[in-house]
Structures are given as structure tokens and as C-alpha cells.
Design a protein with these regions (language model features):
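Amphipathic, interaction-prone secondary-structure segments
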Residues: 41-83
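Hydrophobic transmembrane signal anchors and adjacent membrane-proximal interface regions, especially
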Residues: 4, 36-40, 83, 88, ...
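Intrinsically disordered, low-complexity regulatory segments enriched in Ser/Thr/Pro
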Residues: 69-106
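Negatively charged, low-complexity tracts enriched in Asp/Glu with abundant Ser/Thr
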Residues: 1-55
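Mixed-charge, Lys/Arg-enriched low-complexity segments
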Residues: 1-15, 95-128
């Protein structure tokens, strides 16, 4: 798990902060938090990390895709219970799960894993 603390003025830079946070978590996981060297497949993944991501803008959401799977959705504008920049889990390839935000790319201060953003439950505990 990596904590993304940076705030962002624009959603695009917030998404880049999130992607870099996921990369840092991947490196930490692959090296046992610095106890071993980054080699083989893991090193190849880190070397081409930025090229594995696509950001696709839709009407309400921005879809963040890593390789062929949706990493998350980002809310484009305030709507109902969600704020601009909120990170939502994917319900499928085309739509987010609208149960709970997992953080906000504009305000920062959220937790992420290389497998996806974490969110807080009602007791403010981290959950995958």
C-alpha cells in the first residue's frame, strides 16, 4: 500500500500522481520493501509502466485502464454524492461501482495499491 498525499489542480495531474503511486507500490511489493533487487518480469513491468496505461474521457467519468483491465473511474464533475476527482471502483469495463469513493485525485491523501485504489469503510478502516 502506498499513500498518495499530493494535491492536484487538474484531474490529469491527479491521475498521474495516482499512477505513480501505484508504480511505487508495485516496486515496494516486488522488492519486499527494498530487501531484494528488482529483476526479471518485475523490472520489465516497471521499465514500461507508463506505456501500460490509457486514460479515456467519457461524459461523466474518466476511465483509467491498465493494460486491458479498468483500474478505476474518476468523476469528471460534481454530481449527487460524488465530487469532481473522486476515485470509483470499476463495476465492469463500461461503468463504475457507485457505492463509495476510494479517494480523490484532486485532494490527495488516499491509499493505493498497484492492483487498485483502497477505500475507507464507515469505521475509516482500509479495505481493498
Amino acid at each position: 500500500m502506498y499513500k498518495v498525499e499530493q494535491k492536484a489542480d487538474k484531474i490529469g495531474s491527479g491521475i498521474q500522481n495516482m499512477i505513480q503511486g501505484a508504480k511505487k507500490d508495485y516496486i515496494n511489493m516486488s522488492t519486499s520493501y527494498g530487501k531484494k533487487e528488482l529483476t526479471g518480469y518485475s523490472k520489465d513491468q516497471v521499465d514500461k509502466w507508463e506505456n501500460l496505461w490509457k486514460v479515456e474521457t467519457g461524459k461523466k467519468y474518466i476511465r483509467v485502464v491498465r493494460e486491458n483491465g479498468v483500474f478505476c473511474f474518476i468523476v469528471r464533475e460534481d454530481s449527487g454524492r460524488f465530487k469532481k476527482g473522486d476515485i470509483l471502483k470499476a463495476a465492469g469495463y463500461r461503468a463504475p461501482a457507485r457505492n463509495s469513493a476510494r479517494g480523490n485525485v484532486l485532494t490527495g491523501n488516499y491509499n493505493i495499491q498497484w492492483t487498485g485504489p483502497l477505500y475507507m469503510d464507515s469505521q475509516r478502516r482500509l479495505r481493498a
